[in-house]
Each structure stands twice: as C-alpha cells, then as structure tokens.
C-alpha cells in the first residue's frame, strides 16, 4: 500500500528528481515565472511555498527584534542556511529573503499560481506556467515609428 507516500517519481531516480526540483525552485525564485509540465508545477508548489514562509519568518523577526542583536543575527543566519541547504544558490536565497519576506508578509499562504497553457507540441504533455503571486508587472516596450 502507498499510504503516506508524498510526491511523484516523474520517472527519475531520487537524486535526479531532487536536483531537478532544486534547479526549478531557484529558477522560479529568480525569474518569478517559469513554464513547465503541469505535474511538475503542482509538485514545485509544495517545495517553494515553505521557502517563502522561511523568508516571512525572517521578515517578522526583523520587525520584532533589533537588527543588530545577537538573537536576531543567529536566527536570521539559521533561516538563511535552511533555505541555502535546499536551493544551493546564493542569488536565489538573497532574493528570497530580501524581496519575498516583505512582499508576502500579510499573505497567509498561497504564494504561487498555476496557469494551464495548453499542450506541448512534441508529446502533448499538459503545460503550465507557475508564477509567484503579486509579482511586479513588467511593462513591455512600445515601438515608436
């Protein structure tokens, strides 16, 4: 019986699957929008949302404690190390803690959105965009003739 077995295998070894989701998590944090298959997007959501919660905890500590206190520094470093332990990407960890903690401070979960976008041309796999909610909209450049 498959009781209490969380996640899908995606036809990969455990090390390949783990590396794939670490890379996808870092890409989602850096770009805030990625296109992938629908099952991978659903699995990625369960990985990224706890990372954003770590950033929120650090932001909450920043407001409660003195930033120069040893207690804040110790807890902040511990939270960043937890995130780095999974992501292994300094740029992604920095962006996670400096931008997302403040951005999602008032939101109680649900930091990602999955939008279905049809089927892949080669094998008809269902595709989806996964994006971070409340991301800043980039205005497209308008050509002037």
From Swiss-Prot:
Protein name: Large ribosomal subunit protein bL17
InterPro entries the UniProt entry points to: Ribosomal_bL17 (IPR000456), Ribosomal_bL17_CS (IPR047859), Ribosomal_bL17_sf (IPR036373)
Gene Ontology terms for molecular function: structural constituent of ribosome
Signal peptide location: none
Protein keywords: Ribonucleoprotein, Ribosomal protein
Pfam family, one: Ribosomal_L17
Complexes and interactors: Part of the 50S ribosomal subunit. Contacts protein L32.
PANTHER family documented for this protein: LARGE RIBOSOMAL SUBUNIT PROTEIN BL17M (PTHR14413:SF16), RIBOSOMAL PROTEIN L17 (PTHR14413)
One BP annotation, GO: translation
Gene from which this protein is expressed: rplQ
Organism the protein comes from: Francisella philomiragia subsp. philomiragia (strain ATCC 25017 / CCUG 19701 / FSC 153 / O#319-036)
Domain of life: Bacteria
SUPFAM superfamilies documented for this protein: Prokaryotic ribosomal protein L17 (SSF64263)
Any one GO cellular component localisation term in the record: cytosolic large ribosomal subunit
HAMAP family for the chain: Ribosomal_bL17
Family per record: Belongs to the bacterial ribosomal protein bL17 family.
């Amino acid at each position: 019986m498959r009781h209490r077995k969380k996640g899908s295998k995606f036809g990969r070894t455990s090390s390949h699957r783990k590396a794939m989701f670490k890379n996808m998590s870092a890409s989602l944090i850096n770009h805030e929008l990625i296109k992938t298959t629908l099952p991978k997007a659903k699995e990625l959501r369960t990985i990224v949302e706890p990372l954003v919660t770590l950033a929120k905890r650090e932001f909450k500590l920043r407001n409660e404690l003195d930033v120069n206190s040893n207690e804040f520094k110790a807890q902040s470093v511990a939270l960043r190390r937890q995130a780095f332990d999974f992501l292994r990407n300094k740029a992604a960890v920095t962006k996670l803690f400096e931008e997302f903690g403040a951005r999602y401070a008032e939101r109680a979960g649900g930091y990602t959105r999955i939008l279905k976008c049809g089927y892949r041309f080669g094998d008809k796999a269902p595709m989806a965009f996964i994006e971070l909610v409340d991301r800043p909209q980039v205005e497209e450049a308008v050509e002037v003739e």
